[in-house]
């Protein structure tokens, strides 16, 4: 079906509920202990050309990627009475052709009796002796199979043993030698033994033994079969080029079940003329000189073996089909084709022979056991289920039919039966088997061992071979014929199989060159399938013809495409204006190998209607309908991608009318959707589930939903442990929160259709998916974060785990000082020392040293080392994982995806002329790994401040100068530079150059100084001579301490920023703590100075650094009284918090005290300054309040926070921000904390 590779089948087999037979019990059931020899011989006999398969090596097609398994589970009613061992019973004419020297087997009726292989009788010393005749029944063989001594001593017999094939499921009589003298004489010729070397036999035996070991290991992996033998049904057209060892297993239960005959068909079809005259080919047989062909010629006399071992056979999935028919392998290609054609046509006609000759059963009595000593060859068991269904009591029989698609292997189907523990007598069971076998042998000879038997037993008309070349055509033809013969109670929309449903009986015709292997690991015989009763549920028994339906189902799934795979001609590309993007190999169907130039054609391919297959998928828990095998296998492949093998039941197949085949509606292909199409229509139109009735379904698990919102919620649902799985291909690793999202995300990396958005379930094309993920759903913004269990602080980013650990250890974990002599612990070392001095005075000073212990805040566990606590906290962090969402534009983190979408919509997707900025209500308090609080970044005024002036550019883009690539995601850029160019970048890379920094403040300072040319300058106000400037506040402080120590109390410091813009000023608030070693409040003098410069327009260069300088307006004087009278004009709103050193106003006395200590190093109480200020400005409060222009009830009017410039814009008095509306200014003013609280208290009515 394709050339894709899949995981090893053994790995898949271990994950499924496949009954098996315990190999140990099967070995114990052999009373003679000939398991190894038996397995090797049978494996070798089934190997037409063992040299084609190296010893111990797995089958090359074993890892074929296109292998998609489908398991059909049903149950069957079986007898309470255990069926006896099947033994062959020959007619008198056939027995007359047997050699009189055939060694009898006394225990041939016992199920555990080993075989006598190819007439080689075992002796005590381990060697073999050969009877005179070659046409012998199977016998025992206890010695080494292929020893040099045995091969030299026995000559021809070893060669015959190498050539013979005791077919496990062959139930026909051996080909009479008397009817073909030329063949007989050739077989008996002593010169034949010289054609095969004994060393070659030993090499082949080694290969077989390796296959035995491989096979036993696979059986041990399977699930026990509850003490029941395996009912094996197989159908396998085997190519003569790839046979391999087949390992049988001994029966472990006294009860046995039946095995249908299945001599395989050759790979070459022949005409009807060859079928009618097969004897013409015998001279060609005699003239053949190929040693392999000569060796296989000996297969003619021995056609069958004891059926008990057929029942227990289980093969490795990598082994080819064991059913290499003796007739087929012994005859040349023409004769083989004749037999194959006749077998196939006979089996095609078999469904017409529904009426069995019941009278034949009465002719068989229990005396048939007398013939078992002469031959253990079982007869055809076509109606073996009669022995089951006619029993007095019945118990459920569990059927598992597992079909595996493989390009060039054999088709097998394995049915395992859970039989009852108690068994009836072996003799009665064997007689019953013989009776049923006789009846089916005469009435339904679907597969024969020779053309002569075919001509004697076949009584039905032959169908043309050309009408049954395709499996689907065969199914439709036989189904229509079955419908004409019997009424069917099947509805087109059947959800369950009813009791009276008569499903079409389809025989599986052999198609030359088609090889399929059994996914269940069991190789079984084919040819004619035993019509076992398939039970839907206990009590609902379906007719025996259902087995033919199962055969047809397997034939359809595993049939070879009658036409070669279609490959479009993509050498000439379509015109660019068409907008078609064609892959190099086209859009390929992974199930059948066909490729198409257009994706719509692939969708039509999946939607074609050739039949109707209804199954109940056990994984999806729903009834599904498929109209072609590709759609069914596509559904099975999707389960396979999740590590599951599709298991289904309630199989119903029905043909479709010609009108439905050619008159179907056009479908929307998978993925052919434009971005404008909503997720609702996308999911509605592009569902691959052909039987789905709902418009909203998950493309991954096929769950149906009522609407789009439920589908989105389904993809957003976080499963338990969803934070434990991450995609390692993404950088940083992307958390996969549920199975559907994980499957869709992994398929994006593989670029396999359908491409589904992991966030909302929308199906998109390749070129549309990236745009949808980055702009609509923001899939790549999802990050793995950690939440502190104590304060619910959320940490996100690259080092979020280390950050939350550090936070928990420093903020919440307690440190105690433990007494070295007793269990007492104290929170301080002084307390521990006092305790030791008072309670343990005998301890020396060095022994009194307390020891620090660390207590986990979450589980109260105490550790003696801090490193142990850190390791312990990791165990708690596994439960504290959560998903956070990082804004791709400003790096803010959000705990909810909806909050991120609202933030992006309101902040980054609106026009630059937006009047205001909405409040981020959903933003929670979050910290980056370096301790910054992301939620405390103040909003920027978009109408006034450009993106280039913001701390982090709005539209971030990093470019690699070496390979000229651009990245919008910072992590991807860092990973690219590390992996491709070996450059280790820090957490905050610059967007304008290749520099990187460890903190955002350092990055802002770098952008401001290096790229904008804006330098922050600090002037010394105490230097009366030449103007002294300093690059940092710390250097200025050192200068003042060294040069102006005595003048520090009356000095003020100022900073001059000649080229500062509004954005630089606003960002400098955050940098003040880094540059000056202190944390400046938003009500700082810098903001006041900026506001004054905006209003007054006083240039900074004109302000002289001498005497007392007014910070708001830049007024400078040496007279303090004059200075105090001047600064009163800046006190608006009656506030009494004004700095007497620089004139800056504050909303509260605590802010003023902090300002005095930080800026002026003054610890005096601000009450004196407040009283002086109130005394000097009593007359100006009313006028200043009126000039403020605020409403009487507005807090801004109280503190003078609302100012209006010449352009009619409103300015915040605290920080100097511009706003176009009073409402926006009022909202912004709340961010100033204490200033807003003070204004609110002042404005509150008494």
Curated annotation (Swiss-Prot):
Gene Ontology cellular-component terms listed: nucleus
One matching Pfam family: zf-C2H2_11
Q: Give positions of region: Disordered.
A: 24-387, 907-953, 1045-1093
UniProt keyword annotations, A-Z: DNA-binding, Metal-binding, Nucleus, Repeat, Transcription, Transcription regulation, Zinc, Zinc-finger
The Acidic residues compositionally biased stretches are 929-940
Which stretches are tagged as biased composition: Basic and acidic residues? 24-47, 302-317, 341-350, 360-375
Write out the transmembrane intervals: none
Classification via InterPro entries: Zn532-like (IPR045914), Znf-C2H2_11 (IPR041697), Znf_C2H2_sf (IPR036236), Znf_C2H2_type (IPR013087)
Q: Where are the zinc fingers (C2H2-type)?
A: 587-619, 696-719, 817-840, 854-876, 885-908, 958-981, 988-1011, 1018-1044, 1137-1160, 1210-1232
Q: What is the superkingdom listed in this entry's lineage?
A: Eukaryota
Which tissues carry this protein?
Widely expressed with highest levels in kidney, spleen and ovary.
Query: Sorted alphabetically, which SMART domains does this protein's record hold?
Result: ZnF_C2H2
Q: Where is the composition biased (Polar residues)?
A: 88-111, 163-195, 326-338, 914-923
GO molecular function term, any single one: DNA binding
Q: Where is the composition biased (Low complexity)?
A: 287-301
Q: Decide whether keyword Iron-sulfur is in the record.
A: no
**Subcellular location per the Swiss-Prot or TrEMBL entry:** Nucleus
Question: Of which family is this protein a member?
Answer: Belongs to the krueppel C2H2-type zinc-finger protein family.
State the protein's purpose.
May be involved in transcriptional regulation.
Q: What is this protein called?
A: Zinc finger protein 687a
Q: What is the lineage of its organism?
A: Eukaryota, Metazoa, Chordata, Craniata, Vertebrata
């Amino acid at each position: 079906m394709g050339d894709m590779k899949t995981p090893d089948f053994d790995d898949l087999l271990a994950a499924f509920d496949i009954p098996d037979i315990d190999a140990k019990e099967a070995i114990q059931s052999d009373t003679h202990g000939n398991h190894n020899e038996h397995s090797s011989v049978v494996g070798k006999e089934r190997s037409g050309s063992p040299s084609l398969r190296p010893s111990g090596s797995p089958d090359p097609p074993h890892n074929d990627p296109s292998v998609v398994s489908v398991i059909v589970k049903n149950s069957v009613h079986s007898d309470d009475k255990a069926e006896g061992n099947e033994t062959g019973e020959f007619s008198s004419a056939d027995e007359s052709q047997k050699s009189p020297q055939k060694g009898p087997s006394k225990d041939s009726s016992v199920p555990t009796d080993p075989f006598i292989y190819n007439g080689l009788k075992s002796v005590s010393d381990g060697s073999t002796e050969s009877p005179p005749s070659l046409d012998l029944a199977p016998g025992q063989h206890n010695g080494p199979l292929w020893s040099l001594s045995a091969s030299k001593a026995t000559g021809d017999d070893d060669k015959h043993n190498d050539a013979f094939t005791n077919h496990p499921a062959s139930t026909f009589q051996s080909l009479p030698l008397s009817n073909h003298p030329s063949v007989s004489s050739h077989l008996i010729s002593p010169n034949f033994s010289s054609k095969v070397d004994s060393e070659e036999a030993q090499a082949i035996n080694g290969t077989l033994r390796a296959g035995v070991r491989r096979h036993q290991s696979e059986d041990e992996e399977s699930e026990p079969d509850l003490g029941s033998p395996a009912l094996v049904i197989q159908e396998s057209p085997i190519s003569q080029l790839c046979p391999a060892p087949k390992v049988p297993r001994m029966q472990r239960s006294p009860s046995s079940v039946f095995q249908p005959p299945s001599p395989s068909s050759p790979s070459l079809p022949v005409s009807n003329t060859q079928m009618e005259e097969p004897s013409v080919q015998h001279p060609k047989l005699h003239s053949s000189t190929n040693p392999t062909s000569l060796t296989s010629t000996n297969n003619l006399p021995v056609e069958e073996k004891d059926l008990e071992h057929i029942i227990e056979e289980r093969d490795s999935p990598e082994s080819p089909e064991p059913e290499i028919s003796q007739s087929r392998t012994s005859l040349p290609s023409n004769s083989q084709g004749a037999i194959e054609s006749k077998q196939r046509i006979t089996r095609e006609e078999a469904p017409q022979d529904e009426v069995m000759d019941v009278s034949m059963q009465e002719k068989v009595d229990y005396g048939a056991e007398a013939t078992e000593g002469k031959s253990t060859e079982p007869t055809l068991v076509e109606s073996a289920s009669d022995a089951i269904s006619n029993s007095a009591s019945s118990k459920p029989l569990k059927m598992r039919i597992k079909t595996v698609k493989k390009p060039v292997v054999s088709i097998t189907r394995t049915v395992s039966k859970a039989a009852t523990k108690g068994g009836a007598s072996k003799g009665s069971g064997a007689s019953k088997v013989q009776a049923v076998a006789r009846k089916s042998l005469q009435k339904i000879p679907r597969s024969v061992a020779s053309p002569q038997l075919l001509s004697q037993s076949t009584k039905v008309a032959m169908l043309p071979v050309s009408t049954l070349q395709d499996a689907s055509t065969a199914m439709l033809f036989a189904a229509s014929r079955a419908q004409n013969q019997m009424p069917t109670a099947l509805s087109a929309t059947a959800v369950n199989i009813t009791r009276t449903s008569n499903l079409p009986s389809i025989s599986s015709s052999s198609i030359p060159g088609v090889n399929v292997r059994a996914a269940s690991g069991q190789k079984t015989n084919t040819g004619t399938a035993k019509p076992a009763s398939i039970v839907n549920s206990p009590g609902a028994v379906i007719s025996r013809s259902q087995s033919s339906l199962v055969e047809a189902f397997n034939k359809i799934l595993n049939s070879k495409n009658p036409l070669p795979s279609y490959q479009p001609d993509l050498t000439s590309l379509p015109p660019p204006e068409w907008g078609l993007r064609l892959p190099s190999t086209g859009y390929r169907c992974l199930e059948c190998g066909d490729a198409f130039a257009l994706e719509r054609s692939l969708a039509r391919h999946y939607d074609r209607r050739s039949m109707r297959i209804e199954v109940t998928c056990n994984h999806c828990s729903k009834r599904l309908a498929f109209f072609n095998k590709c759609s069914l296998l596509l559904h099975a492949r999707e389960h396979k991608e999740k590590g599951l093998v599709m298991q289904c039941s309630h199989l119903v197949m029905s043909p479709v009318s010609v009108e439905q085949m050619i008159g179907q509606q056009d479908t929307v292909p998978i993925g052919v959707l434009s971005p404008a199409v909503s997720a609702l229509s996308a999911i509605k139109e592009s569902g691959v589930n052909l039987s789905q009735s709902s418009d909203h379904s998950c493309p991954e698990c096929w769950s149906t939903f009522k609407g789009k919102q439920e589908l989105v919620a389904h993809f957003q649902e976080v499963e338990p442990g969803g934070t434990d799985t991450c995609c390692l291909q993404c950088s940083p690793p992307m958390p996969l929160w549920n199975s559907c999202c994980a499957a869709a995300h992994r398929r994006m990396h593989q670029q396999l259709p359908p491409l589904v958005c992991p966030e909302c379930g929308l199906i998109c094309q390749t070129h549309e998916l990236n745009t949808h993920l980055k702009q609509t759903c923001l899939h790549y913004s999802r990050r793995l974060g950690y939440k502190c269990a104590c304060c619910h602080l959320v940490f996100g980013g690259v080092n979020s785990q280390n950050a939350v650990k550090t936070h928990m250890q420093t903020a919440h974990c307690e440190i105690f000082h433990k007494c070295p002599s007793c269990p007492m612990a104290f929170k301080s070392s002084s307390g521990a020392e006092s305790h030791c001095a008072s309670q343990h005075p005998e301890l020396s000073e060095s022994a009194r040293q307390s020891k620090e212990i660390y207590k986990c805040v979450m589980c109260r566990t105490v550790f003696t080392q801090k490193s142990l606590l850190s390791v312990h906290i990791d165990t708690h962090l596994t439960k504290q994982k959560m998903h956070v969402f990082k804004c791709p534009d400003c790096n803010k983190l959000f705990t909810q995806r909806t909050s991120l979408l609202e933030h992006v919509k309101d902040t980054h997707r609106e026009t630059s002329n937006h009047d205001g900025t909405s409040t981020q209500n959903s933003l929670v308090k979050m910290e980056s790994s370096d301790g910054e609080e992301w939620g405390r970044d103040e909003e920027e005024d978009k109408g006034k401040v450009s993106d280039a002036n913001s701390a982090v550019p709005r539209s971030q883009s990093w470019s690699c100068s070496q390979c000229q690539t651009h990245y919008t995601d910072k992590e991807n850029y860092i990973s690219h530079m590390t992996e491709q160019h070996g450059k280790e970048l820090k957490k905050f890379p610059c967007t304008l150059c290749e520099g990187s920094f460890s903190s955002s403040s350092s990055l802002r300072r770098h952008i401001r100084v290096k790229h904008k040319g804006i330098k922050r300058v600090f002037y010394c106000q105490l230097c009366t001579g030449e103007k002294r400037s300093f690059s940092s506040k710390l250097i200025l402080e050192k200068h003042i301490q060294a040069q102006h120590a005595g003048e520090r109390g009356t000095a003020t410091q100022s900073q001059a920023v000649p080229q500062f813009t509004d954005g630089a000023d606003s960002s400098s608030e955050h940098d003040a703590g880094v540059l000056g070693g202190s944390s400046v409040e938003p009500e700082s003098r810098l903001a006041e100075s900026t506001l004054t410069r905006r209003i007054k327009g006083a240039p900074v260069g004109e302000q002289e650094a001498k005497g007392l300088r007014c910070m708001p307006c830049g007024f400078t004087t040496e007279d303090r009284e004059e200075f105090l009278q001047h600064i009163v004009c800046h006190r608006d709103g009656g506030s009494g918090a004004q700095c007497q050193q620089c004139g800056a106003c504050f909303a509260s006395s605590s802010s003023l005290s902090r300002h005095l200590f930080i800026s002026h190093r003054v610890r005096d109480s601000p009450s004196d300054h407040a009283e002086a200020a109130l005394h000097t400005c009593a007359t100006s409060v009313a006028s200043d309040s009126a000039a403020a222009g605020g409403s009487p009830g507005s807090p801004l009017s109280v503190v003078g926070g609302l100012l209006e410039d010449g352009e009619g814009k409103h300015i915040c008095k605290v920080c100097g921000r511009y706003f176009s509306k009073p409402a926006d200014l009022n909202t912004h003013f709340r961010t100033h904390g204490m200033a807003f609280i003070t204004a609110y208290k002042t404005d509150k009515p008494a």
